[in-house]
Amino acid sequence: MTHVLDVQNLRVSFPADHRRVYPVDGVSFWLDRGETLALVGESGCGKSLTSLALLQLVPNPGQIEPGSVIRLADTDVLALRGEALRRIRGRRIGMIFQDPMTSLNPVFRVGDQITEGILAHFKISRAEARDRALQLLQEVGIPDPVERLNAYPHQLSGGMRQRVMIAIALAAEPEILVADEPTTALDVTVQAQILEVLDRLRTSRGMAVLLITHDLGIVAGRADRVAVMYAGQIIEEAPTELLFANPSHPYTQGLFASVPRITGPLRRLTPIRGNVPAPSAWPSGCRFRPRCPKAFDKSEQEPPLLPVDTDHRMRCWLAERHG
């Protein structure tokens, strides 16, 4: 079966001190229509850069390395240039960027910003595009949508601005929606509302969703599968229920151990020791080795993704002991 999105061996490099460093290094994943994949990890692990690479939006002087593969069904994204590339941005992959206050243009009304996205991809009149913009605001749950069409971004709350960003991302009816930290800086109630909007839209439109987050709490019940990133690599991947029931990589276990729980016995939180190294200082072998409480001699060799169980893999030599 052809996946709606298939990424293989994605590597993104930047020049540094007369050499190149790889903040995204060999990332592979796929998405099917109607499913949600959560890409989870700490800040600086390469999640957002991975999402930008999907649309060839890696900032200069970065580059996507030869040998990387990004396919939208039967389309080779990395072979596209100019108008052909512009057509897939928004039309086949919609993007919700991290900070709606800086992503929205402060001097244009909300309705105009949504309308421009529609007109860029559909040959319709401005009046028809404005009607569609109104429908989109209704679809993402914005009250008084007619009034909000004429508002400027600073006149809206953080939750409302995030809903506008979702409407813009949906304007061209994409097959895939990439949501990069869609609930950052929102209070818990608004977070839940935004996630419910994304779930409802995924179901009603049959879209695939790539949910990028550092927060394990929003993944449970929202994603079909989870891929955990560390130091530019996917280090564990599994269906969500399986990963939450049996986190196997020491880093993933550390993430769960550092999350407060409201049920069960009272226990002390256990932080992961040390800090994530910079791409220019990644260790040889397993990249988590200097921080890992379970490191052993073989950890000095770089592990591939190894099977733990059916549909469950991790980048750790301990997987051999699971077998």
State the predicted function of each range:
Residues 72-76, 128-147, 256-257:
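Conserved ABC ATPase "signature" region
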